[in-house]
Amino acid sequence: MQASDRFNINSQLEHLQAKYVGTGHADLSRFEWAVNIQRDSYASYIGHYPMLSYFAIAENESIGRERYNFMQKMLLPCGLPPEREEE
């Protein structure tokens, strides 16, 4: 791999990280990573009707109620963030 290839790959990665929130970066904490994964999962469940209907049947709820519950869970999917240590 040449230096120009590495530069091109890094610039593409930086572009993706700026464009999409869930792609992460070097300073991403474990909590932020987990939040991105959970939100991505909930968005996928809401966006795919068969999965949404599966959850609705499994939990004996209406599809609208399941959609609402998933959207509410997207607000704080992993609970409150941990307190940061001040340096």
UniProtKB/Swiss-Prot annotation:
InterPro entries listed in its UniProt record: SF3b5/RDS3-10, Splicing_factor_3B_subunit_5
One GO process term, biological-process aspect: mRNA splicing, via spliceosome
Domain of life: Eukaryota
Disulfide links within the chain: none
Name of the protein this chain belongs to: Uncharacterized protein At4g14342
UniProt-listed Pfam families: SF3b10
Similarity annotation: Belongs to the SF3B5 family.
Record organism: Arabidopsis thaliana
Membrane-spanning parts: none
